[in-house]
């Protein structure tokens, strides 16, 4: 009988059964590179986007390392949001059903802390949760985090954004000196460096460029909003799209609320994820989103980070993000695995610069507009810039010609004469260029 691809990691048979139950056919790139390193108890920094199989890249080896006979904490996984912590717990709990004798518990904010204290009477071998709640339980002595020999920090860049790195620091400081730490982050911001330097001795760096794969799976469209308001364009898009699930991203909570109000007034039912929701409202919204009550979900960047929503077929950028890293996070919600995705960005003239910065990251757009109920190609947004660059190049060429023409003839009125000569030659060059373009168009029309 052929070996299962995950057997290459020498995982115990119970975990291979768990992998089969998950229908994992073969390891992803990050799983191939991370699983052996954690099994060797390596300090590491893993840079990867969500949707790459990252969670099981660390959960599987952690489960293998846990000794089911020792009834005390052996590993800790911290996540920046309750939703992500709950998702990690669900994945780990599934694995624990195949490996007998392993206790996994989740500790997150927004729940009754007294009940959490009581749950600590039986210490779990794998602790999963948000850093603040784990800290609260550790400070009172209820949760014995100091006994853990492996700490995994997921979405570390979001820990920075949400101001949680001090809580993570407190947990790391309680560990023994020989404990190992693995840090996972989509980006490595400068603010994260002090923590990495403090706790990770000679870490291995593993970077998985999921962007290339994601870009293959995603169609990127740009829609200009010069002559129409963005809300109107969004409504027009909704008329022609039929997504399985679409996330519409806004730069701020206010923009998200305004857009939701407009769509609701137009009779469109939308879900909402932003920082203004209470923990209870947020939990209810996530449940409704996962139950597919909405085709469209409006989200702000920080509030939606750390939330893994399956089945996103479309992403609409209602606002172009000011932080270009957010663009990567946004579009990475769709086109995951072997699925195709569509990312549509609405932009106004004052957002042109940010679009150029995004293109500098290697993203390639098709510029389209909504015509006759379809997305049809229009002039690329950067054509005018290209013409300006061409004109600048033309001016330099002409100036060089003029200089050589009137060299050694410097007389009164030279500057004025020089300028007139430049303009004259530019007109001639443009005329010549225009003739060439027309000839090319005629040839193309004949071929067509």
From Swiss-Prot:
GO terms for biological process: response to cold; RNA catabolic process. Residues 400-418, 438-448 have a biased composition (Basic residues). GO terms for molecular function: ATP binding; ATP hydrolysis activity; RNA helicase activity; RNA strand annealing activity. Residues 236-386 form the Helicase C-terminal domain. Its EC number is 3.6.4.13. It is an enzyme of class 3 (hydrolase). It catalyses: ATP + H2O = ADP + phosphate + H(+). Residues 35-206 form the Helicase ATP-binding domain. It is found in: Cytoplasm. Its main location: cytoplasm. It holds the Pfam family DEAD. ATP binds at residues 48-55. Disruption phenotype: Cold sensitive. Double cshB-nfo mutants are as cold-sensitive as the single cshB mutant. Keywords: ATP-binding, Cytoplasm, Helicase, Hydrolase, Nucleotide-binding, RNA-binding, Stress response. The keyword DNA-binding does not apply. Residues 400-448 are annotated as: Disordered. Probable DEAD-box RNA helicase. May work in conjunction with the cold shock proteins to ensure proper initiation of transcription at low and optimal temperatures. Belongs to the DEAD box helicase family. CshB subfamily. This is DEAD-box ATP-dependent RNA helicase CshB.
């Amino acid at each position: 009988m052929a070996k299962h691809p995950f057997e290459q990691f020498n995982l115990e048979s119970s975990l291979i059964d768990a992998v089969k139950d998950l229908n994992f056919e073969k390891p992803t790139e990050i799983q191939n590179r991370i699983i052996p390193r954690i099994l060797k108890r390596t300090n590491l920094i893993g840079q990867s986007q969500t949707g790459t199989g990252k969670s099981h890249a660390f959960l599987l080896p952690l489960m293998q390392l846990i000794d089911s006979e020792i009834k005390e904490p052996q590993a800790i996984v911290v996540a920046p949001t309750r939703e992500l912590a709950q998702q990690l717990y669900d994945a780990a709990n599934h694995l624990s059903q195949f490996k007998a004798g392993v206790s996994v518990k989740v500790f997150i904010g927004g729940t009754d802390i007294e009940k959490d204290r009581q749950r600590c009477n039986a210490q779990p071998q794998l602790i999963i949760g948000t850093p603040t709640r784990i800290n609260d339980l550790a400070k009172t002595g209820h949760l014995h985090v100091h006994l853990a020999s492996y700490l995994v920090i997921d979405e570390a860049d979001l820990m920075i954004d949400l101001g949680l790195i001090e809580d993570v620091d407190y947990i790391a400081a309680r560990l023994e000196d020989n404990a190992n730490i693995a840090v996972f982050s989509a980006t490595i911001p400068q603010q994260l460096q002090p923590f990495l330097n403090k706790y990770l001795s000679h870490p291995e760096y593993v970077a998985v460029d999921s962007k290339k794969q994601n870009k293959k799976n995603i169609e990127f469209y740009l829609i200009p909003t010069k002559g129409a308001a963005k809300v109107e364009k969004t409504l027009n898009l909704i008329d022609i799209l039929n997504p399985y699930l679409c996330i519409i991203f806004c730069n701020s909570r206010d923009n998200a609320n305004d857009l939701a109000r407009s769509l609701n007034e137009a009779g469109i039912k939308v879900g909402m994820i932003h920082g203004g929701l209470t923990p209870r409202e947020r939990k209810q919204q996530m449940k409704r989103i996962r139950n597919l009550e909405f085709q469209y979900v409006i989200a702000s960047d920080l509030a939606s980070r750390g939330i893994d929503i399956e089945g996103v077929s479309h992403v609409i950028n209602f606002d172009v993000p000011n932080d270009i890293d957010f663009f990567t996070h946004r579009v990475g919600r769709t086109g995951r695995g072997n699925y195709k995705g569509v990312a549509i960005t609405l932009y106004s003239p004052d957002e042109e610069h940010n679009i150029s910065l995004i293109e500098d990251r290697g993203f390639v757009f098709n510029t389209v507009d909504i015509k006759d109920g379809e997305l049809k190609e229009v002039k690329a947004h950067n054509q005018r810039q290209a013409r300006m660059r061409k004109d600048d190049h033309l001016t330099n060429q002409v100036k060089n010609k003029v200089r050589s023409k009137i060299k050694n003839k410097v007389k009164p009125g030279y500057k004025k004469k020089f300028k007139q000569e430049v303009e004259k030659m530019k007109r001639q060059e443009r005329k010549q260029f225009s003739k060439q373009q027309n000839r090319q168009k005629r040839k193309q029309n004949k071929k067509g």
